[in-house]
Amino acid sequence: MRGGRGAPFWLWPLPKLALLPLLWVLFQRTRPQGSAGPLQCYGVGPLGDLNCSWEPLGDLGAPSELHLQSQKYRSNKTQTVAVAAGRSWVAIPREQLTMSDKLLVWGTKAGQPLWPPVFVNLETQMKPNAPRLGPDVDFSEDDPLEATVHWAPPTWPSHKVLICQFHYRRCQEAAWTLLEPELKTIPLTPVEIQDLELATGYKVYGRCRMEKEEDLWGEWSPILSFQTPPSAPKDVWVSGNLCGTPGGEEPLLLWKAPGPCVQVSYKVWFWVGGRELSPEGITCCCSLIPSGAEWARVSAVNATSWEPLTNLSLVCLDSASAPRSVAVSSIAGSTELLVTWQPGPGEPLEHVVDWARDGDPLEKLNWVRLPPGNLSALLPGNFTVGVPYRITVTAVSASGLASASSVWGFREELAPLVGPTLWRLQDAPPGTPAIAWGEVPRHQLRGHLTHYTLCAQSGTSPSVCMNVSGNTQSVTLPDLPWGPCELWVTASTIAGQGPPGPILRLHLPDNTLRWKVLPGILFLWGLFLLGCGLSLATSGRCYHLRHKVLPRWVWEKVPDPANSSSGQPHMEQVPEAQPLGDLPILEVEEMEPPPVMESSQPAQATAPLDSGYEKHFLPTPEELGLLGPPRPQVLA
């Protein structure tokens, strides 16, 4: 049909016998030997099976049958191999093939070819097995370090040459390095790896191919791991209070581990008091420093002969030769810290900057070494915001160490998490409360302290606050009002003010002047009244009044209420009569006594009744001396 689109030639139904002439036509369109395409076939080893694999071709999918036609021995014989559904490869047993044969291979689905056939030469188109590496590895005895890896080629006819290539990499590195040149199996030479580092782990593996098949490489060999000879640590440093005040944590001698892929044993020597000490059981990578040690030396067990020992002087130099003006700052958009300082008066060999997170053990110390001309260091690492890091700069010279005072650095300061704890001190002066507070833990302060804020609240009145210097931790409060009072303190950094600490509750007495003077006035007034009373009681003018006002047992010389004479008949003393004079005569009529009524019963004698009450009366005129002596009576 004119203008119609013709179907592909392999979709037309053809009888089986008609396929043979067509394949000879398609042979002109076969892919070159070894070229990549939908179908690839190769032999595995000199006596292995023939492996064929393919990729699905669009909507046509995978073949259901694979056809192999001999082109060298029986050109008219075609061998068909069934393919399981869903598989993308098939293995043809070696027993079904002829040695050194040349095959034409294609795949069909429902009797229709899916792709052009490929040409396979069984004599050359083979993948060798993987080579065998090690386990012996030899190392050179001088610098630079070289390693010689022994290996064996895969099983192969002795007259046929294989080309093998090897790759190596350092432990924990991602990229592999190709060793040049490629090696041949005839003659067989070992694998040599140059410019290696001591106390380092390496990995190596390889693969082989036939000499004429440049792109048909065999399988990779298993990876061989090996370790170069151990060496003394290059970087040794001190952690802890080596040159500070004795009594703290014991300092440690630290060195950096060679890496997780290497196992090294170490030996340490210290020079103490003119003799050498070598502690046993040294683990990686620290050792306690004995008191008074002057220098330390570290070496690795079974180290190479040309590797020198690592020495470090432990003598503490005067602080005047230490670096000065150490400052720490953060870098915007970076997780690193910048440390700067000014040099001391000496000429150091190098500067060492070490740092550790607050609260970390001595073993977790980091440090970097810098040339003597460097006066700044960019500390690597992922520093956390709000976390304090102790940073120390030390000048290292041949005579010893001179360390500057440690400083605390922050990548970014934050507001404190807690407030200080308050407690009351002894009043100074009495009546004036004094308080003190503790420091906020550094990891909760989260920055450099700028000041404290002290707040007080009495009753329902609003709180009153005042700022206190960060160097002050105790104050007296003379102006607090009397009554109940609450106190609290907050800490502040440049990032802001933190929450208040625990509240201290006080109850203050009234300390105003009137309440201080009134008790004194009352006391003096009481003394005045008491003095007046005593003076009146003891003076002659009022002496006789005590008999009338006070009980007898009070004014008796020896007061004794139990033995008082108040219960006995009282005999009044009458003053003597005055001499007779011209006094008026008073006529007195004598009255007869009333008659006595006799009772039938005799009168009973009654004892005087003592009720305990003493009768006292006002003095009579005679007692007061207001009247003259009585006149004699004149009887009418």
Curated annotation (Swiss-Prot):
Question: Which PANTHER family would you find in this protein's record?
Answer: INTERLEUKIN-27 RECEPTOR SUBUNIT ALPHA
> Where expressed (tissues)?
Highly expressed in lymphoid tissues such as spleen, lymph nodes and peripheral blood leukocytes. Weakly expressed in other tissues examined including heart, brain, fetal and adult lung, liver, skeletal muscle, kidney, pancreas, prostate, testis, ovary, small intestine, kidney and colon. In the lymphoid system, higher level expression in CD4+ T-cell subsets than in CD8+ T-cell subsets. Also weaker expression in CD19+ B-cells and monocytes.
Q: Which compartments does it reside in?
A: Membrane
Q: Which residues are glycosylated?
A: N51, N76, N302, N311, N374, N382, N467
Q: Where are the transmembrane segments?
A: 517-537
Keyword Repeat appears in the UniProt entry: yes
Q: Which gene encodes it?
A: IL27RA
Task: Provide the function of this protein.
Answer: Receptor for IL27. Requires IL6ST/GP130 to mediate signal transduction in response to IL27. This signaling system acts through STAT3 and STAT1. Acts as a receptor for the neuroprotective peptide humanin as part of a complex with IL6ST/GP130 and CNTFR. Involved in the regulation of Th1-type immune responses. Also appears to be involved in innate defense mechanisms.
List GO terms (cellular component aspect).
Answer: plasma membrane
Q: GO terms for biological process?
A: cell surface receptor signaling pathway; defense response to Gram-positive bacterium; immune response; negative regulation of interleukin-17 production; negative regulation of interleukin-6 production; negative regulation of neuron apoptotic process; negative regulation of T cell extravasation; negative regulation of T-helper 17 type immune response
Query: What is the topology of this protein in the membrane according to its UniProt annotation?
Result: Single-pass type I membrane protein
What protein am I looking at? Interleukin-27 receptor subunit alpha
* Renumbered ranges of motif WSXWS motif: 217-221
Q: Does the keyword Repeat apply?
A: yes
| Record field: compositional bias (Low complexity) | 618-628
Pull the Cytoplasmic topological domain ranges from the record.
538-636
Residue span, Fibronectin type-III domain: 131-231, 322-417, 419-511
